[in-house]
Amino acid sequence: MTAPAGFLPRVGRLIAVALTAVFLLAPTGAEAASRIKDLADFEGVRDNILVGYGLVVGLKGTGDKLDDVTFTKESLIGMLERLGVNTREGKLDPDNVAAVMVTGTLPPFARQGSRIDVTISALGTAKSLAGGTLMVTPLIGADGEVYAVAQGQAQIGGYAVQGQSASVQKGVPTSGRIPNGALVEAEVPFNLSAMESVKISLRNPDFTTARRIAQAINAFLGTELARPLDPGTVLVAVTAGYEGNAVALLTDIEQLLVEPDTVARVVIDEATGTIVIGEKVRINTVAIAQGNLTIRVTETPQVSQPAPFSQGGQTAVVPRTNIQVDEGKDNKLTVVNGGVNLQDLVNSLNALGVGPRDMISILQAIKSAGAMQAEIQVM
């Protein structure tokens, strides 16, 4: 799907992030509908966060400095002593060990013996985890119980190289992943077949969308078994035909098509100059003028030296400052008629010849003037 010819000729990043190729050709009816599984989650069917503390060994001189990071040293001593190695009598100062936090996500219905990915992140002064191996690390859940055990070779996406007078770094060498690095040891108890009702949690709570989901489910089942509890929750009773077989009910429900209702919203990321304008954004009639003021200050100091063989002369640096002020072109007022759609709004702003960052200020000013019927969300 492509944008209309001549659309957004100069706005740069706004071309990609305004999503105009989708919003301007706004679909209707079934084309705008989404599956319930893409709009909501079933309560209880969720991931669980796991975390653990471990040691990465086998680093090439890029590990923690044990004199500075005492918890790494104590952890190493404890691990070696559990393996029967006496370390108390000698000096222990390796540079190939690093303490790390290990995190992972236990997916719903993960069974004992299955594997999950884990992420490792350095805690101490380690410069890189490249080439390291994570030693056996228990991963605990929010209840303090161990659900998985992690171990394996770390995959690092970055690197760091340092010499006596220069260094080069790419990516984040102190963080990495271990694919299938954790073995599930305990399952999260969840009896799906015994459920008498199912709660559907909307990812973007909305009264209208919740009501439409309930209506779609009732129309499919042929009876009033679904009702919205609030903008983010729809309760569905397990009907007689699905008793003891909630999996079949959830499978049928998640495939139903519902057209979600969205809030008119403009999302702005001032740090990157990113603007995302929703399809439903409308504005009242407003006149806009935008002026650019650029001030350039350039320092070009000159060195003044005394004449040859002169007495008492000294070399001096004479400052020289050049200031240029560019007020830009005299932009006239641009009138934006009320009730325009996204294309008309962006085209009117483009007529001012401004970039994304200036457009952020303009959109905020339109909102302050009460002419924009939309919510502005600043990231």
From Swiss-Prot:
Molecular-function annotations in GO: structural molecule activity
Alphabetical list of Pfam families matching this protein: FlgI
GO BP annotations listed: bacterial-type flagellum-dependent cell motility
Subcellular location: Periplasm; Bacterial flagellum basal body
Single GO cellular component term: outer membrane-bounded periplasmic space
InterPro entries (alphabetical): Flag_FlgI
Signal sequence range: 1-32
Keywords assigned by UniProt, alphabetized: Bacterial flagellum, Periplasm, Signal
Family, as annotated: Belongs to the FlgI family.
PANTHER family xrefs: FLAGELLAR P-RING PERIPLASMIC PROTEIN FLGI, FLAGELLAR P-RING PROTEIN
Assembly behavior: The basal body constitutes a major portion of the flagellar organelle and consists of four rings (L,P,S, and M) mounted on a central rod.
Function description: Assembles around the rod to form the L-ring and probably protects the motor/basal body from shearing forces during rotation.
Protein name stated in the entry: Flagellar P-ring protein
